[in-house]
Every structure is written in structure tokens, then in C-alpha cells.
UniProtKB/Swiss-Prot annotation:
Function: Catalyzes the attachment of proline to tRNA(Pro) in a two-step reaction: proline is first activated by ATP to form Pro-AMP and then transferred to the acceptor end of tRNA(Pro).
Coiled-coil portions: none
Chief localisation class: cytoplasm
Name of protein: Proline--tRNA ligase
Top EC class of this enzyme: ligase
InterPro entries registered for this protein in UniProt: aa-tRNA-synt_IIb (IPR002314), aa-tRNA-synth_II (IPR006195), aa-tRNA-synth_II/BPL/LPL (IPR045864), Anticodon-bd (IPR004154), Anticodon-bd_dom_sf (IPR036621), Pro-tRNA-ligase_IIa (IPR002316), Pro-tRNA-synth_IIa_bac-type (IPR004500), Pro-tRNA_synthetase (IPR050062)
Amino acid sequence: MRLSRFFLPILKENPKEAEIVSHRLMLRAGMLRQEAAGIYAWLPLGFKVLKKIEQIVREEQNRAGALELLMPTLQLADLWRESGRYDAYGPEMLRISDRHKRELLYGPTNEEMITDIFRAYVKSYRNLPLNLYHIQWKFRDEQRPRFGVMRGREFLMKDAYSFDLDEAGARRAYNKMFVAYLRTFARMGLKGIPMRAETGPIGGDLSHEFIVLAETGESGVYCDRDVLDLPIPPASVDYDGDLTPIIKQWTSLYAATEDVHDGARFEAEVPEERRLHTRGIEVGQIFYFGTKYSEPMKALVAGPDGAEVTIHGGSYGVGVSRLAGAIIEACHDDAGIKWPEEVAPFRAVILNLKQGGSDTDAACEQLYRDLLAKGVDVLYDDTEQRAGGKFATADLIGIPWQIMVGPKSLAEGKVEVKTRSDGARQMMSPADVVARLGGGTVAG
């Protein structure tokens, strides 16, 4: 993509309404535009990041055996009355009526609808276990939306729902999502720490929040520092095997949100030098809720002996749009964003330091074509902006690889390459740049 043809409305000044780093940088970098309190338009740069986050979530859900579907944003109020949650949910739920006076709601979550789908089609234990998920926009009418996408009213979520014949099966499903979440956040450059948490309006008796440590987080958390060094399960993990050792490894060390924190246990189990009390951002939460929805909604299947059995369920959420903000909170400096490669809007940016110069123009064009041919998602800054402005833009939007093409280095057959993550610079030939980013062999 040529920057001269890309829509990137960068702000020179810090927005006054932005209270935290991620909100400020997302607005400044032209990722978002606020349309109303807690409601944002995702502009091209931000939308590219959002789609890359979504794809990682999708790949890890599929790897764990979940099946994707898509449910509507609007739901019938009667479904929620069946579960007893319509009146209990509170003013955060947006309730509306259509022209026929039918009561609807803009779904803040989907336990009722997915249970309705399940009971309509699944009648036998032979169709279990089953895990269905979707990635869809949600709405919760927050009383005080703030912090940009971290606490908005409209947001993109991945919701998965598991159905099993008994509690043992449901806990196996829970463990699969536990492991999938560890891998999902790690691929985004984050350490999502599973912490015991309250179940809230979802209900049930077992839940973990996945927390990214950040001083700007809304959640107070307590944990053993050693949890930060635990290994992430590899891509080769066998989801059909016994995941209990992984779960025990991650849950044997103390980690809890402030809502369920046990001070006496914390002090008894964790040596003082390993006690960590800080704040964090919730990026996902998983629940085992047994028969909370299947019982009132009569989601039954025929068991092995032919008798009807009430299924056991769980739900598993990831804040897809919130993750964009969480990644920035964890990956930034004073100059701007430092995107991990897997979620960066572009993997590399070519900076033409003498726009209009025949040699630099030709070298940039060739490098641009060669990188595209290798499948590299590259941005070419072909604008008339001065070099200093191009450096500032590249740092602000956080592209992992900055390739600087100037007359002096080009005279030696080289370009300068800077990695945004650590600021390291090196001189490389254009061919070596293409080989490095395109997966080939670097000369020498």
C-alpha cells in the first residue's frame, strides 16, 4: 500500500479526551474516530489491526476444536425471560421494540440464543461434545464509558459455548479453552495471566479472567511473580489429550482478581519477595456454569441409556476490540505504538528519504514490488513529507520494520533497517531485506 493513497488521518496534538495511552495513540495514529460516547468508527489502520487480532483468535479457536457460526446482534426478549436474566441484567442491556411491538434487545452476550439453537437440533449424546463460537459486535450501555476501546459501549467479542453430557466433559471443554487462550494472547505478544474471578451475571461456580498486567488496568490483581515465567503451550499441544498438567501448572500458583482475593492465603502461599499486587486489563474470561441455562430452557439430550439428560455448559469470551488497546498499553514508548509483528497493520514500511530523486525513487519502487511479491504486507511512504516527519509517522503507527532508503546509503548499495521494538539499526542490501522479510536466506 502506498501511503499517498492510504487514508491515515494522523493528529498532531494529543486529544484532550484521551485519559490513557492506548486511547491517545489510537486517536493520534488515525485508527479510530469517536462517533458517540463509547462508540467508535474503525478507520483503515485500526481496522487492519482489528482483523489481524480477530484472525489469531479464530485460528486458535479452530485449533482447539470449536466451530464458528454467526448469531445476530438482536435477540428476542422472550429468550432471556426463559433463563430469568431479562429483568436481572440491569440498565446495561439496550432494550428496543420493533414496529410490531415485539420486544428485542441488542445482545450483550449470547448464552440464551446459543442454547436455543442447541436444543432445536441436538437430541442425542452422540452429537456431543460440541463447542460453537462466533465473533460479533456487542452493546452494553455502560453508565460511564471511558478509556477508548477499553471500556466502550459497542465492542467486538469472540464468544464460545460448550455443550457436554456431564460435568467431567464440561471441565475438559473448559480446559481446552484455558489452553487456547494462553496461546491466543501469546501470539499477540501478550502474557494473558489466568486469574480466579467472580462469575458475575453469566453465573456458574468456576471462572478465570485472563489479565494483561498494566498500571492503567481497571482490575486490581494479586499474583505470584513466578506465574510470569510459566511456559506457553506449543502449537503442537494435543487438545484431545490430557490437558490437566498444563492447567495445574498455571493454577497452582496464586493469581486472583481483587473480587475473590484471599489476603491470608496470599501471604501464606507466596513468599514476600514474590508477591505482586498491581493492576491489569481483562482481555478474556471463561466460565463453567453447569446447567444454569440448559435447565430452565430445557436443553436435553438422550443419554446412553435413552433417558433424558440436562446438558452441562460453559462460555468463553475474548474482547477482540479491547485487545487492540491492551496491546498498545503493553507495547509503546514516548514516540508511539510498537506493534508485535502478528498484529501490526503492516509488517514493514519503506521510507523514501529523498522523494523525487531518481535513484531513491527507483530503489524504493523495486523494493516495494519485491516485498509485495514475497507476500510481505508493506506500506510505502511515497509522500512529500520531510524525512523527520516520515520517521515520526512510522514510529507513531508502530510498524515493526522501518526501511530507510536515502542517497548516501544507496550509493553503497545499502538501506538502513530499524526494528521498532528495540530501536536497533543495521545496514543491509535491498536483496537481504527482501530475503529477511520474505523468508529467504540472507547473504553472508
